[in-house]
Amino acid sequence: KLKKNIQPLEGALEKVQNLRGVSFEWKKDDKKSIGFIAQEVQEVVPDLVKVNRKEHDGVLVSEHLAVDYGNITALLVEAMKEQQQIINKLEARIKALETGEK
């Protein structure tokens, strides 16, 4: 095993609901893209943001935040599972109400 301290993701649906997807253009080349604003993601799920540092001759030249899009997948899967549990409960309630009305 390569991993340790494995913990389930909690509150995934709420976290996903607090993320804001945006469209934007990159400053360097005006290329259009969609995604998230790293600073906003950091407020909701800090583990999804990494700091990219660029150094030259051991001197920090630039530093910026970046969203780790690959890790969002696990959060989305858990959020979908939470949604499905809600859907299943609502379907059961609807069925119970329909059965009771007939």
Regions found by a protein language model. Give the residues of each.
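Active-site-adjacent substrate-recognition loops and nearby beta-strands
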Residues: K1-N5, V22-I34, V59
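C-terminal intramolecular chaperone/auto-processing assembly modules
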Residues: K3-L9, V51-K102
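Residues that recognize and position ribonucleotide moieties
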Residues: I34-G35, L65
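Active-site-adjacent helical/loop segments in soluble small-molecule enzymes
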Residues: V41
